[in-house]
Amino acid sequence: MGKLFGTDGVRGVANKELTCELAFDLGRAGAYVLTETKQKPKILIGKDTRISCDMLEAALCAGLTSVGADVYLAGVITTPAIAHLVKSHGFDAGIMISASHNPYEFNGIKFFNSQGFKLSDQIEEKIEDIILNKKWDEVPHAQFDAIGRINRVELKKDYQEYLKSTLNAASFKGFKIVIDCANGAASAIAPEVFEDLGAEVVVINNQPDGTNINKNCGSTHLQALQEEVVKNKADFGIAYDGDADRTLFVDEEGNTVDGDKIMLLLAQNLKQQGRLKRNTLVVTVMSNMGLFVAAKELGINLEVTKVGDRYVLEKLLEGGYSIGGEQSGHIILLDYATTGDGILTSLQLTKLIRESGKKLSELGKIMKVYPQVLVNAKVENGKKDLYSKDPVILEAIKKVEEKLNGKGRVLIRPSGTEPLIRVMIEGEDYEEIKKDADNLASLIESRLS
């Protein structure tokens, strides 16, 4: 991670940290680095529903066209749709304007290469180097007749058809499903796909107004979905985040089915079909201890990475594996997609539920969830790494670990996208670990404030 790029592109409070000036510079430097050899690169841009997206899109377009790139605006669309469409439609690069699951005041800019993959650290460092060290003399200004043009394109239907093509003509007729679109990019895509496949769909949080994306809804706030599933006597519910790169489920009783359970169910299904490459599932250090126990019982190997879907993807490509993901619902199905795709994952799990003939509550028993507590400590971005050098914090962590005595764990992790340090504790006694996590988070805040 550099000074501009975090674990998921460039992110910050819109118009304060992520300014129009920075978006313009990212457009210029990004187009140059990604398409140096192209005279007239074609770049696809998508956005979610935040109020700041139009402003940042305009600045990006100015930067891109000033170096001669032709821009194609896909409008409001999901992040994984951009990744897919860049490759399927032959664009030279793709850009998504979104801060994913973050509140509306944040926004982000992430790039995809011509194959639909997020950028490597080396490419991001090249872009950063130009911007931070003001190496603009390296970046050409297009001559009058070579300035790029801006075009609007309608590609949503192409993406929806692709999603349906991954299901081998499965039918969801007879299913009643509640879908929470998080007032984000899934609103115009997901409900239509499920309805096309025959499901009866009840949609909530699909009225984006620029400021309500992820607000008490979507995959980070499941309460409304849980209530609607029970009230509507639905078979299950599906939640996405603002840009639909992640998904979580709620069973017919209103219980959460998180990313750990979703990817274990999908991995087990692939294994039964002989399609689980190298018999391996890639997970992160945040996955619940129960997943490790269940995977062993199912005969599935686990590869463990740092938190962040970019690290999951690296491990998938490096090892030649087919599935990996995070507890938060970022799941990468490499046979179908180059990035986490919430709608794709939810379609695959719905197909699995249909073929199993079982209720989701029954399927969810695939693993026993160990009590796990996650508490956020608010710490400025520049101070997030100092916790590991603070003797008082380290001593407090050690004491909690000694108390757990091998029957749990403590994980302290600076967020890659927000000014937070996440304190995660797992153990057998929920009340005890909650108290310890709260105390550790308070200590970290007071020591690093």
Swiss-Prot record:
The modification Phosphoserine is found at S100. GO terms for biological process: carbohydrate metabolic process; peptidoglycan biosynthetic process; UDP-N-acetylglucosamine biosynthetic process. Keywords: Isomerase, Magnesium, Metal-binding, Phosphoprotein. Gene3D superfamilies: Alpha-D-Glucose-1,6-Bisphosphate, subunit A, domain 3 (3.40.120.10), Alpha-D-phosphohexomutase, C-terminal domain (3.30.310.50). It holds the Pfam family PGM_PMM_III. It catalyses: alpha-D-glucosamine 1-phosphate = D-glucosamine 6-phosphate. InterPro entries: A-D-PHexomutase_a/b/a-I, A-D-PHexomutase_a/b/a-I/II/III, A-D-PHexomutase_a/b/a-II, A-D-PHexomutase_a/b/a-III, A-D-PHexomutase_C, A-D-PHexomutase_C_sf, A-D-PHexomutase_CS, Alpha-D-phosphohexomutase_SF. GO terms for cellular component: cytosol. Its cofactor is Mg(2+). The active site is at S100. GO terms for molecular function: magnesium ion binding; phosphoglucosamine mutase activity; phosphomannomutase activity. Binds 1 Mg(2+) ion per subunit. Activated by phosphorylation. Catalyzes the conversion of glucosamine-6-phosphate to glucosamine-1-phosphate. Belongs to the phosphohexose mutase family. This is Phosphoglucosamine mutase. It comes from Caldicellulosiruptor saccharolyticus (strain ATCC 43494 / DSM 8903 / Tp8T 6331).
